Amino acid sequence: MLEDYKKHCKEREEMGIPPLPLDAEQTANLIELLKKDHKESDFLLNLLKERVPAGVDDAAYVKAGFLSDLTKGKTDSPYISREDAVAILGTMLGGYNIQPLIDCLEIDGLADDAADALSNTLLIFDAFNDIFELSKDNVHAKRVIDSWANGEWFTNKSEVPESIKLTVFKVPGEINTDDLSPAPDAWSRPDIPLHALAMLKMPREGIEKPLETIEELKKKGNPLVFVGDVVGTGSSRKSATNSVLWHMGDEIPAIPNKKEGGFCFGGKIAPIFYNTLEDSGAFPVECDVSKMEMGQEIIFEPFNGKIFDASTNEVISEFNLKTDVLLDEVRANGRIPLIIGRQLTDKTREALGLEPTDIFRRPDQEDKSTKGFTLAQKMVGKACGVEGVRAGSYCEPRMTSVGSQDTTGPMTRDELKELACLGFSADLVMQSFCHTAAYPKPVDVETQHTLPDFIKTRGGVSLKPGDGIIHSWLNRMLIPDTVGTGGDSHTRFPIGISFPAGSGLVAFAATLGVMPLDMPESVLVRFKGEMQPGITLRDLVNAIPYAAIQQGHLTVAKKGKEK
């Protein structure tokens, strides 16, 4: 195993990327090596700590089982003490590591370390009840509950700095998600470092050798900021965000081949791309970027809403954050961890009979309008248990239908594992195989064989290759007046309403059964007269942007974009 792995490392190193994370079989072999003396013990230990996926991956199951046995004295290793085992369990996000950590709360000498680990773990889900029950007569479990109630998982993280020096990586014109994550390379999307090599590979005006330029700019010693006039239009690809963050984000301890953080400034940032950046802990800002140039060093002041040229101290752009909650999202390493953590803190405080905490910035929910609600606002309101939701309000509607298609399915699977999802909370989670059915690559064939069981064991529905297209299946299964989501255009609901999302948010909606949403504006479109022979529903859909262009609500030119 070790020889094969080193050979694989060498092949990947030649491409300038890290090796793939360990699978369950490799992890099992690694554990056998760690149980006895070995001359490469540091290398092996690093593999166990840093190169095994977290959450509910099969390899994580093997890793958690071994560490659990170490804590209970059922096995031993010359390189990992019982205390070390608890600390490593604490880096595994959630899922298979939770029960071993709960068990450690009752083991002398390990309970303190286990309490520290659980205090900073957010993906607790149903285990909350076990820990809360235990806290009634176990001081260590009580410490975990108090820590969650005080939001220490959040307050222990460093605040967003008042001033950040960045180096500009600017791509002129409109950058769509196909530029960042090309469709012909869809097969490699789950392998984030490999797929990131395809970023901006299509020749375009104003930029040559983009990846070499990125490496050159990093030598200035500042974080890079991705800058564009119009950023992230087109299909909602989480892979596009993954690629940008792979080149410009921060490493995540104990999570192999994935990064978080980063900065993205755009004259306009497409809404779904903006949300996907938020989810990943990046800092997206819409502002005038006309005075920013490739390689320029700038000072970014998030609280003052100003960006300066670092050499002249001249203000080159001013901005307003879409919401102050963004500052909390960046501090929490992403909107998804913030939502899950905030819910955990709120739930704990409610169970203890405490008032809601004021440590988080909450979305402004004041309803100033006295008008009625649009049909869309009523449907979303129904999913939130209220009469309606105004445009611009933040809400978390219940997801009745969630669709996943096969070119993003493997990425959604990885996100589900990281969310420690062992069962879906949305009523319908459906996986299709319509994109890869006709001409599958070898990697697609493997997906077709492995993904259906993954979806079905969590309570979802999986179609078979050849069963048909995701749209027509969803259309038959939708329930009127309900809300759903799915991978981008695979969410056009003829009844009910849907909001498109990248694969990370699709996984979140499937796991928790709700989805974070800043309610968009409603637009009333009314067709008059009779449908003419030969005119299809697709023609009617295309007539909407055509009419918007004629009325000046939608512009095609890249400068001064109106949407």
Language-model region placement:
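Amphipathic alpha-helical packing elements
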Residues: L2-I31, L326-I339
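Ligand-binding pocket scaffold of soluble enzyme catalytic domains
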Residues: L22, E40, R51-G55, R82-I88, ...
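Amphipathic alpha-helical scaffolding segments comprising HEAT/armadillo-like alpha-solenoid repeats
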Residues: A24-E32, A54-G73, M92-E106, L123-S135
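Amphipathic alpha-helical segments that form the core helices of the histone-fold
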Residues: T27-K35, P397-G403
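Short coil turns that connect the paired helices of HEAT/ARM alpha-solenoid repeats
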Residues: K35-K39, K72-I80, D103-A111, L134-V139
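An N-terminal, globular interaction/scaffold subdomain
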Residues: H38-V62, S77-Y79
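Conserved hydrophobic register position within alpha-solenoid helical repeats
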Residues: E40-L44, L48, S81-I88, A114-L118, ...
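Fe-S-dependent hydro-lyases/dehydratases of central metabolism
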Residues: N97, L101, E106, D113-K563
